[in-house]
Amino acid sequence: HAGMLLPLSGEELRAASPAEFVRCGLAPRRASALALAARNLDLDRLRDDPIATALARLLREPMIGPWSAGVVALWGLGSYTHGIVGDLNLMRLCTNLLGRPATVADTRRLLADYGEWAGLASLHLMHHPLAHRRNHAA
């Protein structure tokens, strides 16, 4: 592939160890979750499933929550319909917008307004100035 960086195949993901994922920048806990999910799931089937089915399968896996499912939906499955719910910057944004500590459900509601573009909206909103302000409601 002439030096191009291509996504790993399902087989390559299943064969990778958590330590290899840590070397790529994942936190150890997320690396363990990814390695376990890669071994438990039929990744090719996941790619071919409707996004709602794929997300439901992901969320049934141990240690996979809405943030991880959003990352997989966006970058692994190429779907823009599911945002990165619960992301720290989105939590800060919601906290500053609402004037109270935000919940994961608040980030879900924020992204729901963007419909089929919630995934792209989540990436954009992570860079909103209020997402980086730490002087928010306690």
Identify the meaning behind each predicted range:
Residues 1-138:
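HhH-family (HhH-GPD) DNA N-glycosylase catalytic core used in base-excision repair
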